[in-house]
Each structure stands twice: as C-alpha cells, then as structure tokens.
C-alpha cells in the first residue's frame, strides 16, 4: 500500500505550538491622525500578538499584506536580534504565516521582503501554509552593482 504525503519543511520544534490567548486592541485616540471614518490603523507592539488581535474581526478580509521580517543576517540591532538559529527563525515565521493566512481574503495578496539568507526556506514554508499553487511570482531588486558591472 502506497502512503501519500506532502512535501514539507521540517525543523526542531515545528510541531510545538505556543498557545496564544485572544487579544484586544486598545485605540489611543491621541495618536490618531486624518479622517476618523477610515478603518486604517497603525498597531504598535509585538507583531504576533497584534496579528492574533486582528483575527477575530479581520479573518478572510485582508486584501493586501506586506511584511518585512528579520533577515536573520547574524547582526544584533537595538530593536531585535537578527541572529537566531534557523529553526527558531522558521518557527517564528510559521506562527505568523498561519495567522496571516487566516486574515488573507480569497483574492488577497501577500508580499514578503527578504534577502537571500532565509528566502528559500520562507518560500517552502509559504508553499506549505498558503499552498504551492497560490505562488504568483518572485520580485528581485538590484541593490548594488556587481563587481565589474557597467551599471547601465
């Protein structure tokens, strides 16, 4: 008997789920700006907890998501540590991607900005979470000229 399976990325701790309690966003009207009748919002805080807070009201309703996760370059910044073991980085991303998938509308699009360090792992993870057939394209941005390039 042939067993059917799927392609997936595995890492230490992948199936250890952290239980997140529902969260409530509290508006700070003193920081509001512009038309008060729009539904736009800026959320300041831990992004995992903020995403969890959005689940109740916005599941299946978000048309466009843009994320710029840590590149895991090995650097240490004041705001965050960009030097974590790859399995930890993948687990952090998996938790967020699963919530983003719930928030995304059927006709929605997600854009992820990464460098080469974790790009391929993120792509396989996203194939697993969003479905490989939902991938549209990868956009490469030239950030500097290669050695010997004319630049033209």
State each model region's role:
Residues 74-80, 122-124, 138, 150:
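Short, solvent-exposed loop/turn and secondary-structure capping segments
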Residues 47-49, 71, 116-118, 142-145:
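Short, flexible loop/turn elements at secondary-structure junctions
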Residues 86-140:
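Conserved Class I SAM-dependent methyltransferase catalytic core
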Residues 59, 79-84, 125-131, 152:
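Short secondary-structure boundary/capping segments
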Residues 1, 33-34, 102, 150-152:
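A general structural signal for short secondary-structure junctions and capping/turn motifs
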Residues 17, 86, 120, 145-147:
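A generic structural micro-environment signature
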Residues 136-152:
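Class I S-adenosyl-L-methionine
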Residues 1-66, 73-87, 92-95:
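DnaQ-like (DEDDh/DEDDy) 3′-5′ exonuclease domain used for proofreading
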């Amino acid at each position: 008997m042939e067993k059917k399976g799927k392609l997936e990325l595995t890492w230490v701790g992948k199936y250890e789920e952290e239980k997140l309690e529902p969260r409530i966003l509290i508006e700070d009207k003193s920081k509001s700006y512009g038309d008060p009748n729009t539904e736009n919002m800026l959320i300041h805080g831990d992004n995992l907890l903020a995403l969890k807070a959005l689940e109740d009201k916005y599941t299946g309703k978000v048309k466009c998501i843009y994320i710029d996760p840590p590149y895991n370059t090995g650097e240490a910044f004041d705001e965050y540590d960009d030097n974590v073991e790859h399995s930890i980085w993948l687990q952090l991303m998996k938790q967020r991607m699963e919530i983003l998938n719930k928030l995304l509308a059927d006709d929605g699009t997600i854009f992820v900005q990464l460098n080469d360090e974790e790009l391929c792992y993120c792509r396989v993870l996203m194939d697993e979470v969003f479905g490989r057939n939902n991938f549209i394209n990868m956009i490469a941005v030239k950030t500097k000229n290669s050695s010997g390039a004319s630049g033209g």
